[in-house]
Design a protein with these regions (language model features):
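Solvent-exposed interaction patches of small proteins and small membrane subunits
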Residues: 1-112
Length: 112
C-alpha cells in the first residue's frame, strides 16, 4: 500500500469516526433502542471503520499496536455477520468512548 493510499484510508477512518461523534452528540444511549435510523447509522459507521482497518497492511497495523486493530476488525466482523447479536450497550460504548479515542490516535498518526 502506498503512503498516499495509507493516508487516504486513515482519513476515511477519521471521517467515519466524526460521523459517529456527530450522531452520538445529539442523542442518549436509550435512543439506540427506540430510533432504528440512529442505530443503523451507528452500526454502519462502526462497520466502515472496521472495513477500512482491514485494508491497512498487517505489518503496518503491527507497528502501531497502540491501536486495538484486532478488536476493531473483530467488531466489524460481528456487525457484518451477526449484527443482531450486538447489544445496544456495546454499540453505545464503542460509539461514545472507543471511536473518539481511535479518532484522536489516527489524527496523531496523520500528523506524523
Amino acid at each position: 500500500m502506498s503512503d498516499h493510499d495509507l493516508a487516504l484510508t486513515l482519513r476515511q477512518i477519521v471521517e467515519f469516526a466524526d460521523e459517529i461523534a456527530a450522531l452520538v452528540a445529539k442523542r442518549a444511549r436509550k435512543d439506540l433502542d427506540i430510533n432504528r435510523e440512529f442505530r443503523r447509522a451507528s452500526e454502519r459507521c462502526v462497520e466502515l471503520i472496521g472495513e477500512a482497518a482491514t485494508r491497512l497492511p498487517e505489518n503496518w497495523r503491527a507497528s502501531h499496536s497502540e491501536i486495538p486493530w484486532r478488536q476493531i476488525i473483530t467488531m466489524r466482523n460481528v456487525m457484518i455477520h451477526g449484527y443482531d447479536v450486538v447489544m445496544a450497550d456495546v454499540l453505545w460504548d464503542v460509539a461514545a468512548n472507543d471511536v473518539p479515542k481511535l479518532c484522536g490516535e489516527i489524527k496523531l498518526l496523520l500528523e506524523k
